[in-house]
Regions:
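Bacterial N-terminal signal peptides that target proteins for export
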Residues: 2-15
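Enrichment for repetitive, rod-forming helical segments
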Residues: 15-18, 53
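Hydrophobic h-region of N-terminal signal peptides that target proteins for export
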Residues: 17-25
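Long, charged/polar, soluble alpha-helical segments
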Residues: 24-160
């Protein structure tokens, strides 16, 4: 697997991964602390913590792809998708009770993740794109669902 860094986004991706790797050497792993906080939280706060955990997994996956560890990166993308699904389920249950706490913050984070995954998909080799493209589609679809939770169905708005 080789990454192509001819594009501007590729260079920024490499710089971001290098910076993240340098910071990771200094700081302890935040994932267990985030997971514990998410397990203890409820509602919108739980969803926000879960989506931060998903973003952390996507960052780790990006680093793995840069270091040409494709299997590890694909596994981390799968974990990110699971955290995002749990966050959405939490928000969906909350919305059933008429509450929308945290939906906007989660949607913003999901948009950032989705854009980062689209950049990563452009930079990895064709044979390694499948897990990245799948994760990018998952997060794009999740964002659409979150927007639907926030604003309701656009089709129904036109009928009113």
């Amino acid at each position: 697997m080789q990454l192509t860094f001819g594009s501007r986004s590729g260079r920024w991706l490499l710089l971001g991964c290098g910076l993240s790797a340098a910071l990771a050497m200094q700081a302890p792993d935040p994932a267990p602390k985030l997971q514990a906080a998410a397990d203890a939280a409820q509602g919108g706060k739980r969803a926000e913590l879960l989506i931060h955990l998903a973003h952390l997994e996507v960052d780790r996956a990006t680093q793995a792809y840069v270091q040409q560890q494709v299997a590890q990166g694909a596994g981390q993308l799968g974990a990110a998708e699971q955290h995002a699904a749990a966050a959405y389920l939490t928000l969906q249950q909350q919305a059933a009770h008429g509450k929308k706490n945290g939906v906007r913050k989660v949607e913003i984070e999901v948009r950032k993740i989705s854009l980062g995954l689209q950049d990563l998909a452009r930079d990895v080799q064709l044979e390694d794109q499948s897990p990245v493209a799948h994760a990018a589609k998952t997060f794009t679809d999740l964002r659409d669902h979150l927007l639907s939770l926030l604003f309701g169905d656009a089709e129904n708005k036109g009928a009113k």
